[in-house]
Amino acid sequence: TKKQIYEDIYDDSLWLINLVENLLAVTRLEEGRMKINLTTELVGDVIAEALKHIHTKSEKQKIIVIQPDDLLLAKMDARLIVQVLINLLDNAIKYTPSDSQITITAKQSENMVCISVADNGNGILDEQKSRVFDMFYTGANKIADCRRSIGLGLSLCKSIVNAHGGEIKITDNIPHGAIFTFTLPVGEVEIHE
């Protein structure tokens, strides 16, 4: 139908805009041309903002947030960290069954805030783990519409987290699945007198 064609064109144009924005962001970050506006933010608010932009495959697919400290603060450019969370959550949704559970955990570890996105999908092979953050690497797990996954999302995540002075890594979620964890500097409450 015409309506479906228009919807497909609209979806494809949004995908293309997102692709160009991600590519420009990675390039600017790696060349040091993107200014990062660090402010102290409530981690829970940033997670909530990212979740507004996420659409699961089905109602059975659940996203759970575990954050022991409601007042957890981190220094970040909130707009960029929202993008990191969106990319990690989109990946988890894309590579897990429609009845799966995705867990976001945020906690403080010494002078860093650790935020992780865990899924119970098939996981990532050990030989792919060292390359998942490389630009244009999509791995062996091809999705139905493989042109949609060109390997920019995780590369952008790494560039953003590194620009914040943090690190990002991937580990196995036992018995199956993957956990992406990134760190940000702890934020402090600023009191203006």
Model-derived regions: residue spans:
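Short alpha-helical Gxxx[C/S/T] motif in the catalytic ATP-binding
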Residues: 153, 157
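Short alpha-helical segment of the dimerization/phosphotransfer core of two-component systems
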Residues: 11-16
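Conserved catalytic submotifs in the C-terminal HATPase_c
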Residues: 37-42, 62-72
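Short helix-loop "hinge" at the ATP-lid/N-box region of the Bergerat-fold HATPase_c
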Residues: 92-93
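Short conserved segment of the HATPase_c
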Residues: 124-136
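Conserved micro-motifs of the catalytic ATP-binding
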Residues: 31-36, 73-76
